Amino acid sequence: MKSFYTLLVSQWLANIGDVLYIVALIASLYQQTGSAFMAASFPIAVTAGMTLSGLFFARILSRYSLGKTLVLSQLMKTVTLVLVLLTDSIFVLGLVVLIAFLDGFARPIQASFIPRLTKNRQQANSLVQGSNQFIQLAMWPLGTMLVSFTSSAFALIVSLVLFVLSTIVTIYFNQSLTEDIVNDGAEESITLRASLTYVNTSPFARHVTWFVTYESFVSTLWISALLLVYLERHLQVDTGWWGTLNATFLISMIAASAHLYRSRRAPSLPSTAIISIVAALLFGMTAHLAFAILALVIQGAATQIRIIQTNTVIQEQIPATQLPYVYSVQQTGYALAFSVGSLLFGLLADGLPIDSVYLLGALLTLPLIWIGRLTEQSMLTVSSV
């Protein structure tokens, strides 16, 4: 359990550093170019990096253990951030792609370690996800304040210090491991194709991957940009409420994590999809701010429960040797689906009334009930074998 908390601390340091460097670079790019498009291009750069990492993940892991790969990815992120500090041009976006590429190795590995480090997987996943959301909730406004009161360069230096500390803790974590996952098969068997083949041939892995991917697609209905459009066009209230809506969503996710941390059971995947449909319908039909906030509370909790539940059942049902590869495939699917969803709902918001977009989103969430049911049925099949 000590190793789990060491891993968690390294993840906290890296995540705080991630938020700070992104806030700093967004502000810096906007100041340099005056282009909102350049400042808004970060999600595209991050998605590109995450997608590319999925193409190389299996090959890298065939050469290095999970612990060593985690250390190398964090160390190279630190070196890349040094290059960001030395780069004063729009080419910094290429370095953002590289950092996201390295993150694409770290995140599946961190999730894969959980079943090896702790027995209570639901509790562990609740702690991981809840703390991640708390960092997002706290660090975005704090990061913005740091940049405003100092400079983007100073915020980047603070981020670099955090990356260095994360690297040190990660090295300590790797050295403290008594057992690591090392592939015993032939090197040529561990490829992206082999990972995709496993996901495709295992009913549970296939269904849960489709669930994670489709959930990523429909979750873009609730991105911050659409919430701003909803406030301006539908509720027609002061956009100062935008921050409140975003904070409400994150606080709801943290509360759901706290509940599952103490609970032994969690709602089924299909039931959380139904709850999300209710939230989208309420959000699209109401004309009152209070009910809109209530819908966000409902949706935030349902989303977090799905994230924790899917991670928990994946760690329980997928063999430890296959777990990192399944996570890598899912991460690639997640990133692509999130990009497609953001683009689709953004285009719909330009052409339709925003309330109609949320009602359509409720309709598009319906297949998630069916996919969730298939996932749980295949999970029962695996458990009975």
Predicted features and spans:
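Juxtamembrane intracellular "pre-TM" segments in multi-pass secondary transporters
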Residues: 1-4, 175-210
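Hydrophobic transmembrane alpha-helices of multi-pass secondary transporters
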Residues: 3-6, 10-11, 38, 42, ...
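Short amphipathic helix-loop junctions that connect adjacent transmembrane helices
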Residues: 20-37, 225-240
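Substrate-agnostic recognition of the 12-TM MFS/MFS-like secondary transporter fold
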Residues: 6-22, 46-58, 70-77, 95-148, ...
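MFS-fold secondary transporters
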Residues: 21, 30, 80-84, 99, ...
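C-terminal transmembrane bundle of multi-pass solute transporters/carriers
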Residues: 40-59, 63, 67-73, 232-385
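Hydrophobic alpha-helical transmembrane segments
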Residues: 90-94, 100-101, 123-177, 247-248, ...
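A single, central transmembrane helix in multi-pass transporters
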Residues: 150-157, 196-254
